[in-house]
Amino acid sequence: GIRNISAAAYLRLTAPLIRYRLHGIHRDAHGRVICPNRVVAKVSRVEIARQFFSPPPEKLLTRLIQNGDITEAQATLARLVPVASDLTAEADSGGHTDNRQALTLLPTMIGLRDETMARFNYTDPINLGLAGGIATPEATAAAFAMGADYVLTGTVNQACIESGTSDLVRQMLAEAQQADVAMAPAADMFEMGVK
C-alpha cells in the first residue's frame, strides 16, 4: 500500500485524510504506537499547521468510528499521534501562495511544532521543512541554518532537463532574477481572485 502522501492546500482536516493516517495504527511489542501511514503536510498558515501538529479532532474520530472506518482502539491510539508526521512550511513560492516570508514563517512554525510536541508528549519528532523561493545553494543553506530539517523545491526544478518543458522555458527560468517575477491570477482559482 501507499505509506506516504503529501497533503497540500488544506484549509481544514478531512475525514478521508484522518482515515488514511490511522489505517493500520497499532502498538508494537514494546508498547510503542506505530502509525504506518505518513502524512507530509504543506502549509503556509499557522492555524492550519496547528491542526496538522495536533492529534485528529474528536469530531472526526467519532464520525470515523460511527462509519466503521476505525475502531475505538484505533481512536484511542490516534489521540497520541499528530495528524502530520512531517510538515513543510511554505513561504512565498511560484505556485499558490499566501506570500509568507521564510524568515518569519519557519521560526514561527518551529516554535509551534516544539510547543505542540511538548503539550501532547509525542515520542516521535515531527520533521519540519521549508519550501518557497529555494532556488540556490545559499538559500538551501539558509533554510538549514534557520532550523529546517529538509527543503522542498518546486519551480527551480522546471529549469532541469528532466522537467520535460521546452529549451526556451528552461533558459528563461535559469536566467531569471528575483525582480523578474510578479504575482499573477491563478488559472484554477481565477474567479475567486486568487494569485
What do the predicted segments below correspond to?
Residues 6-7, 11-14, 92-93, 108, ...:
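Catalytic or ion-translocation cores adjacent to nucleophile or general acid/base/metal-coordination motifs
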Residues 1, 127-135, 153:
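Glycine-rich beta-strand-to-loop/alpha-helix junction loops that act as flexible
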Residues 1-125, 138, 157:
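Active-site entrance/lid segments in N-terminal catalytic domains of soluble metabolic enzymes
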